[in-house]
Amino acid sequence: MSKKHKIKPAVAVNNRTADPYITLGAGRVESDAFWRWGDDNLFPNALALMARRSVTHRRIINDKADYISGKGFTCDEAQQPRLAAFLRHVNGDGESLRQVLNKLAFDKALFGNAFLEAVTDAGHTFLSLHHQDASRCRLARDSAHVLLHHDWTAFKAAEARTLPLYPAFEEQSDGTLRAVIHYKDYEPTFEHYGVPPY
């Protein structure tokens, strides 16, 4: 009878720095336009990659977002028909308030930050709420605006959208007034961004 030896694979990581988070891009990014989110400004990308590589980690993040958003929001439709209609469709994409809240809760659980864009007009005749992907948001150096960019590995100021932080609203080229609400928990020494809760 021969005995088979099972070989168990092992993974070793050589950490080049005292910081346990892996730097994905250049060692350090300097800019006078925005506050870096991590040394290479790609910390959200590293967190998203970590969640994609661990089924358990991702499941916990998804479950947390689902628990927070629950089954959605309800109200007495007979008493408040406009509120009920708003809860069903909070933006032009047809998303419900629950869907937007679920995305915000996911970002907050994964990144420690979430960004909600509020849209209205000068007469406040409507309100539209849009989730903004936290991995695409950075705080401007004036700490009063948020920069939205599609690819922070190749940032070009001309391609970035700039929106004010709530409660300030600024008129945009389409005539709407917009602001971004930045959700984060207080963390000592982290003035601009929140820290993931894990």
Feature map (PLM): residue ranges:
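Structured, contiguous alpha/beta core segments that scaffold functional sites
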Residues: 2-56, 60-198
